[in-house]
Curated annotation (Swiss-Prot):
GO terms for cellular component: nucleus. The gene is AL5. Ubiquitously expressed. The record marks 214, 220, 224, 229 as: Histone H3K4me3 binding. It comes from the Eukaryota. Pfam families: Alfin, PHD. The keyword Cell inner membrane does not apply. This is PHD finger protein ALFIN-LIKE 5.
Amino acid sequence: MEGGTAHYSPRTVEEVFRDFKGRRAGIIQALTTDVEDFFQQCDPEKQNLCLYGFPNEVWEVNLPAEEVPPELPEPALGINFARDGMQERNWLSLVAVHSDAWLLSVSFYFGSRFGFDRADRKRLFSMINEVPTVYEVVTGNAEKQTKEMPSSANQNGNRSKSNSKMRGLESKSSKTIHAKDEEEGLELEEGEEEEDEDEDEHGETLCGACGDNYASDEFWICCDMCEKWFHGECVKITPARAEHIKHYKCPTCSNKRARP
C-alpha cells in the first residue's frame, strides 16, 4: 500500500514528525489543490475506499490493506459512500477530521513500536500540535487562528460558547429524532400532552428503507427531498456524520437526481 515506502520506519521523534508532516501534506493536497481528482476517485459505486497520505507527500485513494491486522493503522473506511449525500464542503470536512485522527494514530503507533518514553511522546505531540490540523486547513480556520491569536482566557470562553452552540444545534435539529429527556421537578400538563402526541406520531413513522416502525432508542434521519424518515443504519448515516449534513438526500433521491 505504501508504494516505495513500505519498509520505511521512523525511529526518532524527529523522524516520526517528518513522517507525519509528509503524510499530512499529501492529504491536504488531495483535499485542496487536487480536490477535483480526489472527488472523482471517491465513486460511491465502488467498494469501501480510504484516503492514504504517504511520507513523500503523495496521496492515494485505495481499498484498505488485505492483511489483518494491517502493518499500520488504517484510515477511515468507506469515505466514498457519503460523497453524494452531503454538500461537497461538508463531505471534505468530514474526511479531513477522520484524516487528522489517522495521522495521529500512525505517529503514536511508531512511538509505541519504538518505545518512546513519556518525554518523547510529549515532545512529539507538542511538535504535531504546533501545525494546523488538516480540518483547520481545509475549512480555512487555520488562517483565522493566525490572524486572531486570542489569549488563553478568551480561548476558554470561546470554547464554552462553542460547546453551548453545539448543544443548541443538536437540540434544534430537524433531521434527527431523539427521545425527549424527562425534566425532574417540571411536570407541566401541556408539555406532557405534547410529548404524548409526538410519541404517537413517531410511533406511526415507518423507515423508508426497511419499513420498520420508529423506536425511541434508534437514530433516524429525514430526507429533505422526499421527506421520508430512515433508520441511520439503513442509509449508512451516523449521528456524527449527520451533524455535517445540511441537506440530506436519501439514496433513492440521490440516484434520481444523478440520472440525465
